[in-house]
């Protein structure tokens, strides 16, 4: 049953037109030459796989910050949030998750809260695995405020192949932890700026699963009584 469920996983709506195009081209290729058609079948299946949008089980305990993306934790550094959010120069711990073309590219909210600001900034399309991609590449930043007033920043960053950032939320939108808020095509990166003082619970090289992997526990930074 689990295997059947994985095969029948729905795709994100951003993939619908691509699936139609790939399928149409496949039909034409079959008409031209049968072996070419089978190549088209493989590419169509890859398209469906790329845009897959599986359900996730998100931990619900207060204070947890979950991964917004599937991929590999490739950087954990200290940095200031994007200047377009207007948060000043206060340094936070930044956890970067790199998505290759085989990862699920649907992005999910790292915490429950209200979107206070959405800021898009055009830029380059460097390899998203590079540290400087955070500053140089095209990006879309979200400032999310939890009910307790704590603010978390998540940044969608375009990559060498990714040329399309999709964000489905606007300022004032209330998000649940793990809720889908966007997607990036094809291969990219997400940065999460943790609450001040929060200690990351992941390590560089670790595999992260969107909406499930816990990046940090901000409650643990509160002073003990």
Curated annotation (Swiss-Prot):
EC number assigned by the record: 4.1.1.65
Record's GO cellular component terms: plasma membrane
Mod. after translation: Is synthesized initially as an inactive proenzyme. Formation of the active enzyme involves a self-maturation process in which the active site pyruvoyl group is generated from an internal serine residue via an autocatalytic post-translational modification. Two non-identical subunits are generated from the proenzyme in this reaction, and the pyruvate is formed at the N-terminus of the alpha chain, which is derived from the carboxyl end of the proenzyme.
Pathway: Phospholipid metabolism; phosphatidylethanolamine biosynthesis; phosphatidylethanolamine from CDP-diacylglycerol: step 2/2
Active-site positions on this chain: 188
Taxonomic superkingdom: Bacteria
Free-text remark on how the cofactor is bound: Binds 1 pyruvoyl group covalently per subunit.
Reaction(s) this enzyme catalyzes, per UniProt: a 1,2-diacyl-sn-glycero-3-phospho-L-serine + H(+) = a 1,2-diacyl-sn-glycero-3-phosphoethanolamine + CO2
Chief place of localization: membrane
HAMAP family named in the record: PS_decarb_PSD_A
Subcellular location: Cell membrane
Gene Ontology terms for molecular function: phosphatidylserine decarboxylase activity
GO biological process: phosphatidylethanolamine biosynthetic process
Membrane topology: Peripheral membrane protein
Record text on subunit structure and interactions: Heterodimer of a large membrane-associated beta subunit and a small pyruvoyl-containing alpha subunit.
Pfam families given in the database record: PS_Dcarbxylase
Keywords on record: Cell membrane, Decarboxylase, Lipid biosynthesis, Lipid metabolism, Lyase, Membrane, Phospholipid biosynthesis, Phospholipid metabolism, Pyruvate, Zymogen
Protein family per UniProt: Belongs to the phosphatidylserine decarboxylase family. PSD-A subfamily.
Record's protein name: Phosphatidylserine decarboxylase proenzyme
Cofactor(s) the record lists: pyruvate
Positions bearing Pyruvic acid (Ser): 188
InterPro entries (alphabetical): PS_Dcarbxylase (IPR003817), PSD-A (IPR033175)
Residue numbers marked as site, Cleavage (non-hydrolytic): 187-188
Function noted in UniProt: Catalyzes the formation of phosphatidylethanolamine (PtdEtn) from phosphatidylserine (PtdSer).
């Amino acid at each position: 049953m689990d295997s059947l469920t994985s095969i029948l996983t729905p795709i994100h709506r951003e993939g619908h037109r691509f699936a139609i195009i790939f399928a149409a081209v496949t039909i034409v290729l079959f008409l031209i030459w049968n072996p070419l058609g089978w190549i088209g079948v493989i590419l169509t299946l890859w398209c469906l796989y790329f845009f897959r949008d599986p359900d996730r089980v998100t931990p619900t305990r207060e204070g947890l910050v979950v991964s917004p993306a599937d991929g590999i934790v490739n950087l954990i550094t200290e940095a200031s949030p994007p200047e377009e959010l207007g948060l000043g120069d206060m340094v936070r711990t930044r956890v970067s998750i790199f998505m290759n073309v085989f990862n699920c590219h649907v992005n999910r909210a790292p915490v429950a809260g209200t979107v206070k600001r959405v800021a898009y900034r055009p830029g380059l399309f460097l390899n998203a695995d590079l540290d400087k991609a955070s500053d140089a590449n095209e990006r879309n930043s979200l400032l999310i405020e939890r009910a307790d007033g704590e603010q978390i920043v998540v940044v969608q960053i375009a990559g060498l192949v990714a040329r399309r950032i999709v964000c489905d939320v606007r300022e004032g939108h209330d998000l649940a932890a793990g809720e889908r808020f966007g997607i990036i095509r094809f291969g990219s990166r997400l940065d999460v700026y943790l609450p001040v003082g929060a200690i990351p619970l992941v390590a560089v090289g670790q595999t992260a699963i969107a909406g499930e992997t816990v990046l940090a526990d901000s409650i643990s930074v509160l002073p003990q009584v």
